[in-house]
Amino acid sequence: MASLIDDDDGEFLIGRLLVAMPGIEDPRFERTVLYLCAHDEDAAMGLAVNRPVEGLTVFELLNRLGVRSEIQAPSDLVLLGGPLERERGFVLHTDDFSSPDSTLPVADGVALTATRDALDAMASAIKRPRKSLLALGYAGWGPGQLEQELRDNVWLICDADEGLLFDEDHEHKWTRALAKLGITADHLSATAGRA
């Protein structure tokens, strides 16, 4: 199991996955897998990567926003990135796309863009990132909040990989993240404690 901070280089959990424990008290995060885009001593920010918005595809959202798609109707589902600022869109994508002044490199091969440039790129036959997901809203923590949740065994920490992060099989991402840690939901208790 990983510690709060990577002992090798002193980095926080940027670019890692948080996997909700069974029995999480907030139903908005039940069976959720979050990708941490930012994390330092003052705050943390992440996107849920397995919570589709019911019946809303990227193509439909692009149409609503007046973004003309050059590619065959993308059937990717829009994700609910978290409970904060749900009217704001975030595109998590491979780093083969970058928008000057608005793309934030997150971790090896992954970047985040929260401007119209990313939507235009998703709709483009030429500029489209190799892999991407569109999320509305985000999850956020203030100073020490995430660290306390980790001490309280609310989340497991898992290394992210492109296959798990961008896979469209959202329903099974939680169990796949657990499997990557070498466990199943049956191994976990809905109650937390410390030995």
Swiss-Prot record:
Pfam families for the chain: DUF179
InterPro entries: AlgH-like (IPR003774)
One of the record's GO cellular component terms: cytosol
Family the entry assigns: Belongs to the UPF0301 (AlgH) family.
Protein name (Swiss-Prot/TrEMBL): UPF0301 protein CCNA_03506
Organism: Caulobacter vibrioides (strain NA1000 / CB15N)
